[in-house]
Regions:
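Glycine-rich phosphate/adenylate-binding loop and adjacent beta-alpha elements
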Residues: 1-33
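A glycine-rich, Thr/Ser-enriched phosphate-binding loop motif common to dinucleotide/cofactor-binding enzymes
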Residues: 15-21, 37-60, 73-81
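Short helix-loop-beta connector
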Residues: 38-40, 63-69, 133-134
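Helix-to-beta-strand junctions that scaffold the AdoMet/dcAdoMet cofactor pocket
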Residues: 65, 155-156
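Adenosine-nucleotide cofactor-binding segment
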Residues: 69-72, 87-150
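Short strand-turn motif at the edge of the Rossmann-like AdoMet-binding core
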Residues: 143, 165-167
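Glycine-centered, small-residue-biased loops immediately flanking beta-strands
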Residues: 159-160
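Rossmann-fold NAD(P)-binding glycine/threonine-rich loop
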Residues: 167-175
Length: 175
């Protein structure tokens, strides 16, 4: 894609397309996520929205590779699916959360490291420490707002940030 962003690049099913729950419709091919080659239609139909969002972000768009490091924010649906998909793909996972109870749950689901953003408001620095100042290959950014600065801070040069949500707001001053 060349030139400035265009609104049409951000119109996908469920985002800005009317009729996404229709039985039949004509849409652009890039609005769909391909079914993995070895999956049946029945298996693909079991993917919930959060799982499909995580899959598209880290596998289709992010091209996650084994042994890469990914940061997932929080313990919501998209982040939990991203954590589990990344672990199944052989990646290292760092998660952020706000409590020790949630941290333990994230670890039980496979997180290699968990950073409490209440204890580390500039959690990107803690992620850098955990990665020997290399940063992460991928960030699943669901918070938006000021969190985006920390995502940029901890992303490896040339890393991939999937902006999925704006739970903390849609504006941020990039530092």
């Amino acid at each position: 894609i060349e030139g400035p962003p265009k609104y049409e690049y951000f119109s996908f099913i469920g985002d800005n397309e009317d009729g996404y729950a229709s039985e039949y419709m004509t849409i652009k091919a890039n609005a769909l996520t391909p079914i993995p080659k070895d999956w049946s239609l029945q298996e693909a139909a079991t993917l919930p929205c959060a799982g499909l969002t995580a899959w598209r972000a880290i596998m289709e768009e992010g091209n996650l590779q084994p042994n890469e490091t990914i940061l997932v924010q929080g313990s919501g649906g998209v982040s939990i699916f991203a954590l589990q998909l990344a672990k199944a793909h052989g990646a290292n996972v760092i998660a952020t959360t706000s409590s020790e109870v949630k941290a333990e749950k994230l670890k039980s689901l496979g997180a290699d490291e968990v950073v409490n953003y209440k204890e580390h408001p500039q959690w990107g620095k803690e992620v850098l420490r955990l990665t020997a100042n290399e940063g992460v290959d991928h960030v699943v950014e669901v918070a938006g707002g000021e969190s985006f600065n920390e995502s940029i801070r901890c992303a490896k040069l040339g890393g991939h940030i999937s902006i999925i949500g704006i739970l903390d707001g849609n504006t941020s001053e990039i530092l």
